[in-house]
Protein backbone atom coordinates (compact mmCIF):
# COMPACT_ATOMS: atom_id res chain seq x y z
CA UNK A 1 0.00 0.00 0.00
CA UNK A 2 2.94 2.28 0.60
CA UNK A 3 5.85 2.88 -1.70
CA UNK A 4 8.84 1.15 -0.17
CA UNK A 5 11.51 1.76 -2.78
CA UNK A 6 14.27 1.36 -0.20
CA UNK A 7 13.23 -2.24 0.51
CA UNK A 8 13.24 -3.10 -3.18
CA UNK A 9 16.63 -1.42 -3.54
CA UNK A 10 17.94 -3.68 -0.77
CA UNK A 11 16.54 -6.84 -2.39
CA UNK A 12 17.33 -6.27 -6.08
CA UNK A 13 21.13 -6.49 -5.78
CA UNK A 14 20.73 -9.89 -4.13
CA UNK A 15 18.60 -11.10 -7.04
CA UNK A 16 20.84 -9.60 -9.69
CA UNK A 17 20.21 -7.81 -12.95
CA UNK A 18 20.23 -10.95 -15.10
CA UNK A 19 17.68 -12.82 -12.96
CA UNK A 20 15.44 -9.74 -12.75
CA UNK A 21 15.54 -9.42 -16.53
CA UNK A 22 14.56 -13.10 -16.81
CA UNK A 23 11.54 -12.62 -14.55
CA UNK A 24 10.40 -9.46 -16.34
CA UNK A 25 10.71 -11.22 -19.70
CA UNK A 26 8.75 -14.23 -18.38
CA UNK A 27 6.05 -11.83 -17.18
CA UNK A 28 5.95 -10.05 -20.55
CA UNK A 29 6.55 -6.82 -18.65
CA UNK A 30 7.32 -4.05 -21.13
CA UNK A 31 10.81 -4.13 -22.61
CA UNK A 32 12.09 -6.13 -19.57
CA UNK A 33 15.28 -4.03 -19.71
CA UNK A 34 17.11 -3.89 -16.38
CA UNK A 35 20.13 -2.21 -17.93
CA UNK A 36 23.61 -2.78 -16.60
CA UNK A 37 24.42 -4.37 -13.24
CA UNK A 38 24.93 -0.81 -11.92
CA UNK A 39 21.27 -0.04 -12.75
CA UNK A 40 19.95 -2.84 -10.50
CA UNK A 41 18.66 -0.45 -7.81
CA UNK A 42 17.14 2.12 -10.17
CA UNK A 43 16.22 0.44 -13.48
CA UNK A 44 12.49 0.85 -12.81
CA UNK A 45 12.78 4.39 -11.42
CA UNK A 46 15.17 6.21 -13.74
CA UNK A 47 16.61 3.41 -15.80
CA UNK A 48 15.87 1.68 -19.05
CA UNK A 49 12.75 -0.29 -18.05
CA UNK A 50 9.70 0.98 -19.92
CA UNK A 51 6.16 -0.22 -20.41
CA UNK A 52 3.23 1.14 -22.40
CA UNK A 53 -0.31 1.42 -21.12
CA UNK A 54 -1.38 -1.50 -23.33
CA UNK A 55 1.50 -3.65 -22.08
CA UNK A 56 0.61 -2.74 -18.50
CA UNK A 57 -3.01 -3.82 -19.08
CA UNK A 58 -1.83 -7.09 -20.65
CA UNK A 59 0.45 -7.77 -17.66
CA UNK A 60 -2.28 -6.96 -15.13
CA UNK A 61 -4.76 -9.14 -17.03
CA UNK A 62 -2.35 -12.05 -16.73
CA UNK A 63 -1.94 -11.26 -13.02
CA UNK A 64 -5.70 -11.21 -12.44
CA UNK A 65 -6.13 -14.51 -14.33
CA UNK A 66 -3.22 -16.11 -12.42
CA UNK A 67 -1.54 -16.63 -15.77
CA UNK A 68 1.97 -15.56 -14.72
CA UNK A 69 4.73 -18.03 -13.81
CA UNK A 70 4.11 -17.57 -10.07
CA UNK A 71 3.19 -19.95 -7.28
CA UNK A 72 -0.24 -19.88 -5.66
CA UNK A 73 1.47 -18.68 -2.47
CA UNK A 74 3.00 -15.73 -4.33
CA UNK A 75 -0.41 -14.70 -5.67
CA UNK A 76 -1.90 -15.09 -2.21
CA UNK A 77 0.73 -12.75 -0.77
CA UNK A 78 0.91 -10.20 -3.59
CA UNK A 79 -2.71 -9.54 -4.53
CA UNK A 80 -3.96 -8.43 -1.07
CA UNK A 81 -1.17 -5.85 -0.88
CA UNK A 82 -2.78 -4.08 -3.84
CA UNK A 83 -6.25 -3.84 -2.24
CA UNK A 84 -6.96 -0.10 -2.26
CA UNK A 85 -10.68 0.25 -1.64
CA UNK A 86 -13.76 -1.89 -1.05
CA UNK A 87 -17.48 -1.42 -1.37
CA UNK A 88 -20.59 -3.49 -0.80
CA UNK A 89 -20.03 -5.71 -3.84
CA UNK A 90 -16.70 -4.58 -5.28
CA UNK A 91 -12.97 -4.48 -4.58
CA UNK A 92 -10.49 -2.09 -6.18
CA UNK A 93 -6.87 -3.26 -6.42
CA UNK A 94 -4.36 -0.61 -7.45
CA UNK A 95 -0.79 0.64 -7.28
CA UNK A 96 0.68 4.03 -7.95
CA UNK A 97 3.95 4.68 -9.72
CA UNK A 98 6.03 7.66 -10.64
CA UNK A 99 8.74 7.98 -13.27
CA UNK A 100 10.98 10.93 -12.57
CA UNK A 101 13.70 12.18 -14.88
CA UNK A 102 15.91 15.22 -15.21
CA UNK A 103 15.75 14.91 -19.01
CA UNK A 104 12.05 14.14 -19.57
CA UNK A 105 8.59 14.87 -18.27
CA UNK A 106 7.71 13.12 -14.99
CA UNK A 107 4.94 10.55 -15.43
CA UNK A 108 2.56 9.31 -12.75
CA UNK A 109 0.89 5.90 -13.03
CA UNK A 110 -2.18 4.37 -11.43
CA UNK A 111 -2.75 0.75 -12.43
CA UNK A 112 -4.89 -2.10 -11.19
CA UNK A 113 -8.25 -3.74 -11.53
CA UNK A 114 -11.77 -3.60 -10.18
CA UNK A 115 -13.64 -6.76 -9.21
CA UNK A 116 -17.34 -5.98 -9.41
CA UNK A 117 -19.75 -8.57 -8.04
CA UNK A 118 -23.04 -6.96 -8.98
CA UNK A 119 -24.54 -3.67 -9.94
CA UNK A 120 -24.99 -2.36 -13.46
CA UNK A 121 -21.76 -3.82 -14.85
CA UNK A 122 -20.52 -7.00 -13.10
CA UNK A 123 -17.08 -8.33 -13.97
CA UNK A 124 -13.41 -7.46 -13.76
CA UNK A 125 -12.09 -4.21 -15.16
CA UNK A 126 -8.34 -3.88 -15.66
CA UNK A 127 -6.92 -0.37 -16.03
CA UNK A 128 -3.66 1.47 -16.53
CA UNK A 129 -3.59 5.23 -16.38
CA UNK A 130 -0.66 7.57 -16.69
CA UNK A 131 -0.42 11.31 -16.74
CA UNK A 132 2.22 13.99 -16.95
CA UNK A 133 3.16 15.26 -13.52
CA UNK A 134 3.66 19.01 -13.67
CA UNK A 135 2.97 19.93 -10.04
CA UNK A 136 3.37 16.89 -7.78
CA UNK A 137 1.34 18.34 -4.88
CA UNK A 138 -1.79 18.62 -7.01
CA UNK A 139 -1.21 16.11 -9.81
CA UNK A 140 -0.33 13.02 -7.76
CA UNK A 141 -3.76 12.75 -6.04
CA UNK A 142 -5.52 13.25 -9.38
CA UNK A 143 -4.47 9.80 -10.67
CA UNK A 144 -6.76 7.67 -8.46
CA UNK A 145 -9.55 10.23 -8.70
CA UNK A 146 -9.47 10.20 -12.52
CA UNK A 147 -9.58 6.40 -12.67
CA UNK A 148 -12.36 6.20 -10.09
CA UNK A 149 -14.42 8.72 -12.07
CA UNK A 150 -13.89 6.74 -15.29
CA UNK A 151 -15.10 3.58 -13.51
CA UNK A 152 -18.17 5.48 -12.29
CA UNK A 153 -18.78 6.83 -15.80
CA UNK A 154 -18.88 3.32 -17.31
CA UNK A 155 -21.17 2.04 -14.55
CA UNK A 156 -18.59 -0.24 -12.93
CA UNK A 157 -18.58 1.71 -9.64
CA UNK A 158 -21.38 3.54 -7.88
CA UNK A 159 -21.16 7.31 -7.76
CA UNK A 160 -19.73 8.60 -4.46
List each model region and its residues:
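Mid-domain, small-residue-enriched loop/turn segments at the edges of structured enzyme/sensor domains
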Residues: 8-65
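Extracytoplasmic
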Residues: 6, 24-29, 51, 87, ...
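Short helix- or helix-capping micro-motifs
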Residues: 1-3
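Structured C-terminal helix/loop/strand segments within mature extracytoplasmic catalytic/sensor domains
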Residues: 13-16, 59-160
Amino acid sequence: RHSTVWIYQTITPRIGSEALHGWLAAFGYGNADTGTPEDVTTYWLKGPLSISVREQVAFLTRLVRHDLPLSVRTYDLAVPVMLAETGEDWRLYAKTGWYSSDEAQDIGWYVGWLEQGGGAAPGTYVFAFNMDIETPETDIPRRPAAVRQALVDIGALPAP
